[in-house]
């Protein structure tokens, strides 16, 4: 669900950026900001959570932050606000992804690890591809506002599922 929500925007990000007055440099700055923030925060979060018992919970926390900042797209009216949303999304990504990767890796058997990682990586590409197509239809035939609402709702659903899974994982261990 999370990858579908994120994938809905995809390359439409550039069109949205132009609609709020952005140019090529603004689009570049916004996307670079997201990548740099998440790239710098990944190892920091990984280090902090390395021996934590909260790894699985952090997936839900990252998803919840992602939901907040996805809905924040609805409030964006200029490129400065867009940059702030990108920072928030980068932080959310850096909290949830290393935690998910560590949890996933802990559940793998050595005999299936390469295949399992292939599925984990391949499904994100496939889901994002389908989502981009759907997102394009929503943006073209309805609006970016509708697209951001759909993205936020799907992200919220992913967060709820992850919170439930976190709760089940914690209580199964007891």
Predicted regions and their residues:
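Helix-loop boundary and gating motifs at the non-cytosolic
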Residues: 1-35
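Loop-to-transmembrane helix entry/capping segments in MFS-fold secondary transporters
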Residues: 24-25, 108-120
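Residue-level signature of mid-helix packing/kink "hotspots" within the transmembrane helices
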Residues: 35-43, 128-129
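Helix-to-loop junctions at the C-terminal end of transmembrane segments
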Residues: 41-54, 139
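Structural signature of the two symmetry-related core transmembrane helices
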Residues: 57-71, 152
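Hydrophobic core of transmembrane alpha-helices in multi-pass small-molecule transporters
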Residues: 80-96
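Intracellular juxtamembrane helix-capping segments at the cytosolic ends
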Residues: 95-108
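A membrane-interface helix-boundary motif in multi-pass transporters
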Residues: 137-155
């Amino acid at each position: 669900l999370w990858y579908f929500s994120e994938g809905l925007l995809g390359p439409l990000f550039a069109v949205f950026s132009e609609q709020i007055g952005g140019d090529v440099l603004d689009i570049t700055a916004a996307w670079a900001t997201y990548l740099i923030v998440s790239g710098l925060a990944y190892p920091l979060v990984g280090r902090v959570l390395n021996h934590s018992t909260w790894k699985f919970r952090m997936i839900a926390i990252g998803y919840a932050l992602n939901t907040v900042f996805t809905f924040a797209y609805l409030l964006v009216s200029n490129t400065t606000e867009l940059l702030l949303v990108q920072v928030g999304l980068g932080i959310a990504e850096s909290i949830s992804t290393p935690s998910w990767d560590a949890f996933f890796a802990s559940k793998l058997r050595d005999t299936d690890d390469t295949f399992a990682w292939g599925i984990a990586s391949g499904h994100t590409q496939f889901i994002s591809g389908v989502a981009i197509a759907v997102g394009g239809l929503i943006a073209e035939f309805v609006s970016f506002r509708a697209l951001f609402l759909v993205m936020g709702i799907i992200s919220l659903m992913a967060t709820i599922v992850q919170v439930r899974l976190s709760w089940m994982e914690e209580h199964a261990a007891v």
